[in-house]
Regions:
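Non-catalytic terminal extensions of ATP-dependent helicases
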Residues: 379-397
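Conserved helicase RecA-like core
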Residues: 2-383
Length: 397
């Protein structure tokens, strides 16, 4: 189904924006969700990441808000700052030919005063993390009396992160709401509870990832040890000449430690975790997107919602305890119909867990890259003068 087929119910400026963004055919979630939201139905949509959910709820919201009113009419809740920023940017792109539409994004880690000024200046759409939205509500910085549409994006993750109480309070404050839509990778007990309490005759949508639409990601499972782990990581990155790599660790401590170790080896690296200020996080992400950083080491929560194209490889330095975290991690590579590669490091005691992940991703074998000969000799690093070499190192094994 083509976006132009929505012309009878969607503003022409939005159709024009989809064309400018290079969109032609709608994804399955967009075909199913857009008509329901345009009709004002409550909805629970189960769909994996990367299926076009932002456009699925963005088009109906932009079509229904009144540009003449600068009162918030739609609120979109996101579990993380990065995802909130990404949603707001996507909505701005969809609204690029609607100059009267104002979108404000509010999240923790940034100053309240600036966000309050933006809210008081007026907008039709607010994208927010739950805690920060409640902060503004308590400070009387936002008028929610005109909000008719509420969207919970990544609802399962948001409620699992401890925002259940905040989400309930937010919905309770919006007395004039007409529709509540939840988009979620899984339908957890908490998601169902919110549905039972606040939705009426909700439409349910399930979108399964199609085999042919899944990214082509070659997955390597590497048995290693604590003593050899760093050496193995360095050999992979150098041997493959990767220019943009994401490395995932389980904890903030491991993330910072690994980033320091890689930096001492001469790699262009930084880390992303929950203890950083929003300004620091934004700068790190900008450096990574612009190519000034070759390696980004991150925790799962800190990396949630990050959208970076052309990630050459994802390396799971620690085995994730959650299946969803693994699929979200490796989904950072192999985007835009490009082939990707991921590596999972594990110790012998974790082999059973790795086999579970293999079944999850329909892999059948534990495989190590045949093009590497891990001899675990000491790494010697030399600085190179060639500024075009982003790693700035030379290694001998």
């Amino acid at each position: 189904m083509n976006f132009t087929e929505l012309s009878s119910s969607v503003r022409p400026e939005i159709i024009r924006a989809t064309q400018a963004m290079g969109y032609t055919e709608m994804t399955e979630i967009q075909q199913k969700a857009i008509p329901l939201m345009l009709a004002g139905h409550d909805m629970i949509a189960k769909a994996p990441t990367g299926t076009g959910k932002t456009v699925a709820f963005g088009i109906p919201i932009l079509s229904k808000v009144d540009p003449a009113s600068l009162k918030p009419q739609a609120v979109i809740l996101s579990p993380t700052r990065e995802l909130a920023q990404q949603i707001a940017q996507d909505l701005q792109n969809l609204a690029q030919f609607l100059p009267d539409i104002k979108i404000v994004c509010v999240y923790g880690g940034a100053g309240l005063d600036k966000q309050q000024r933006q809210l008081k200046a007026g907008c039709q759409i607010v994208v927010a993390t739950p805690g920060r939205l409640m902060d503004h509500y308590r400070h009387h910085a936002i008028d929610v009396s005109h909000v008719e549409t509420i969207v919970l994006d990544e609802a399962d993750e948001m409620l699992n992160m401890g925002f259940y109480k905040d989400v309930k309070q937010i919905i309770d404050t919006m007395k004039n709401r007409k529709s509540l839509s939840m988009f979620s990778a899984t339908i957890s007990r908490e998601v169902m509870d919110i549905g039972w309490m606040y939705q009426k005759d909700a439409e349910e949508i399930t979108v399964q990832p199609k085999e042919e639409s899944q990214p082509k990601i070659t997955q390597y499972m590497l048995e290693t040890s604590g003593r050899n782990k760093l050496s193995d990581l360095a050999q992979i990155i150098i041997g493959e000449c990767y220019k943009r790599v994401m490395v995932f660790c389980d904890t903030k401590f491991n993330t910072a430690t690994l980033a320091n170790q890689l930096a001492r080896l001469g790699f262009s690296v930084d880390c992303l975790h929950g203890d950083l200020s929003q300004k620091e996080r934004n700068q790190i992400m900008q450096n990574f997107r612009d190519g000034r950083l070759a390696i980004l080491v991150a925790t799962d929560v800190a990396a949630r919602g990050i959208d970076v194209s052309d990630v050459d490889a994802v390396i799971n330095y620690d085995v994730p305890g959650d299946n969803e975290h693994y699929t979200h991690r490796i989904g950072r590579t192999g985007r835009a119909k490009k082939e990707g590669v991921s590596y999972l490091f594990y110790v012998p005691e974790e082999k059973k867990r790795v086999q579970e992940l293999l079944r999850l991703t329909r892999n059948t074998d534990l495989c190590t890259p045949v093009h590497f000969d891990f001899n675990h000799e000491h790494i010697v690093v030399e600085k190179k003068q060639d500024s075009a070499d982003r790693f700035q190192i030379k290694c001998y094994f």
